[in-house]
């Protein structure tokens, strides 16, 4: 049965965004949303007809050209010119899933009736989404104020038969798409180009994608860390509730409880130990993983607000009879949190790599580099090198993009957020963290075999059994990179162990 999501003023959660994108929902406008869009457009048309006062971006030029008035017969051409001139993207393409989130968020933002778009324009964006049309958008070009002008220009050019798209497995021009689908080119009305291009949907889409993936990785990090702790013959006392009750950060409490749940019933963890404590990368898992959880919760809260907002300019307020040029396009509210999340995810990878290092170090009864005959075999030596390389790259990406600002548009736009750069850096670091965690899993599962016949917990034994269906125990040196790739794929496709995680 076809799954339908109705675009309305009801709250749109990140969980719902993930459901729509990854479970192939179709979109449709609620009747209330249709009425709001039509009402706002009607008000704007009437405002233009009766007012002699210039309205920024509606009857004037853009940016530093805001004082140049545009005659009424040029208003439609002004919108086309805006879209063409602002399509200056460079670099790699924005991934398909993120482009689809951009489309969804742009439709949602326009549906509130504060932007002045025509109903037919919003409906065509919905047509794109429902048909699986993916406009080709580029990673570089947005300074994060006035919104995401460059990527949103590429997103919306196909409305008028320009730009390029991917559709049904091939790349084609916007004109070819319209011909193929028998769609008319949209005749943009006044202000529409600005409504389409102004907004934070590119930044917000990267943030949504990152939160959705990072929450999964945060759960995986706990599972893998628990496996590493047991394979390293670590101690459980550092996870006792009494320890964390006296420093009750929520993420810390949740992580300690979850590690304890994951290791419940382990023969290895219950054995008496000769060592009195573990290295920080094991002992401080609750404090580090927990802080990442708290960061995720904060950033999700910010993005939750952003994706339920109208972020273009000027803001059209029919009830107040106002068209106000302001700054809701500025990306600062999400640029800073995305930089924060980049740092948090880099730290999650950082501590993971440290555990991998300990596993291959030939201590706690484990052989050097986790291979039975070290010397003739190098074993897992270089997996740690790879993790170290990736972690180092992520650390280099932790310089906050939002710390920089370069004036644009002849100084009229003299402070920008660089939030799009924060988003693309975050995208890289989240993917890097997934790879580092996959490498830790590869090492931890290998190390566990040297504890046999003792067993870890039933939950983790099931996890390892599933993992062994795709990645074997390594007895002698083999080409390793396919197993790293399979480990990454395992994290992407395998269901997390059922321990009722809180985040």
Language-model regions, residue ranges each:
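Conserved, non-catalytic sequence blocks in retroelement Pol enzymes and Pol-derived host proteins
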Residues: 114, 143-145, 375
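FAD-binding glycine-rich core of flavoenzymes that anchor FAD
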Residues: 114-140
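Cysteine-centered functional microenvironments
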Residues: 137-142, 319, 323
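C-terminal auxiliary extensions adjacent to catalytic cores
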Residues: 2-25, 29-36, 40-43, 48, ...
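Alpha/propeptide regions of enzymes that mature by internal proteolysis
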Residues: 93, 113-118, 219
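Generic short alpha-helical segment signal, independent of protein family or function
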Residues: 67-70, 83-91, 103, 107-110, ...
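N-terminal flexible segment immediately upstream of the FAD-binding catalytic core
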Residues: 1-53, 58, 62-64, 69-90, ...
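FAD-binding core of FAD-dependent oxidoreductases
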Residues: 56-70, 74-78, 85-110, 138-160, ...
């Amino acid at each position: 049965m076809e799954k339908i999501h109705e675009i309305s003023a009801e709250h749109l959660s990140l969980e719902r965004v993930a459901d729509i994108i990854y479970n192939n929902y179709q979109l449709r406008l609620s009747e209330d949303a249709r009425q709001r869009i039509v009402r706002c457009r009607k008000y704007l048309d009437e405002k233009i007809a009766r007012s002699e006062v210039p309205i920024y971006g509606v009857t004037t030029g853009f940016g530093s050209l805001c004082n140049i008035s545009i005659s009424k017969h040029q208003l439609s051409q002004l919108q086309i010119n805006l879209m063409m001139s602002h399509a200056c993207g460079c670099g790699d393409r924005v991934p398909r899933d993120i482009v689809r989130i951009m489309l969804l968020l742009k439709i949602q933002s326009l549906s509130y009736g504060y932007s002045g778009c025509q109903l037919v324009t919003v409906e065509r964006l919905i047509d794109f989404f429902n048909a699986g049309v993916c406009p080709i958008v580029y990673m570089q070009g947005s300074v994060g104020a006035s919104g995401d002008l460059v990527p949103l220009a590429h997103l919306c050019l196909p409305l008028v038969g320009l730009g390029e798209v991917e559709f049904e497995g091939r790349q084609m021009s916007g004109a070819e798409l319209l011909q193929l689908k028998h769609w008319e080119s949209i005749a943009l009305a006044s202000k529409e180009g600005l409504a389409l291009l102004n907004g934070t949907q590119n930044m917000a889409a990267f943030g949504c994608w990152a939160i959705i993936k990072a929450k999964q990785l945060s759960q995986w990090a706990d599972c893998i860390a628990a496996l590493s702790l047991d394979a390293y013959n670590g101690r459980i006392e550092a996870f006792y509730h009494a320890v964390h009750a006296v420093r009750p950060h929520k993420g810390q409490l949740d992580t300690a409880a979850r590690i304890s749940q994951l290791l419940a019933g382990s023969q290895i963890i219950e054995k008496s130990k000769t060592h009195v404590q573990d290295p920080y990368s094991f002992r401080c898992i609750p404090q580090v993983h927990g802080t990442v959880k708290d960061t995720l919760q904060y950033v999700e809260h910010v993005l939750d607000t952003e994706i339920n907002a109208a972020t273009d300019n000027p803001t059209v307020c029919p009830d107040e009879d106002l068209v106000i040029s302001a700054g809701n396009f500025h990306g600062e509210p999400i640029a800073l949190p995305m930089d924060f999340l980049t740092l948090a995810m880099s730290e999650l990878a950082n501590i993971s790599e440290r555990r991998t290092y300990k596993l291959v170090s030939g201590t706690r009864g484990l052989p050097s580099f986790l291979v039975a005959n070290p010397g003739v075999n190098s074993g897992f030596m270089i997996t740690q090198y790879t993790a170290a390389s990736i972690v180092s790259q992520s650390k280099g990406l932790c310089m906050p993009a939002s710390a920089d600002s370069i004036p644009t548009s002849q100084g009229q736009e003299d402070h920008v957020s660089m939030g799009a750069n924060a988003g693309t850096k975050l995208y890289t670091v989240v993917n890097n963290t997934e790879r580092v965690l996959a490498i830790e899993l590869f090492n931890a599962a290998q190390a566990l075999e040297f504890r046999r016949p003792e067993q870890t917990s039933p939950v983790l034994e099931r996890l390892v059994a599933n993992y062994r269906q795709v990645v074997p125990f390594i007895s002698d040196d083999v080409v390793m990179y396919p197993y790293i790739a399979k480990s990454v794929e395992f994290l992407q496709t395998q269901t997390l162990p059922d321990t009722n995680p809180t985040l």
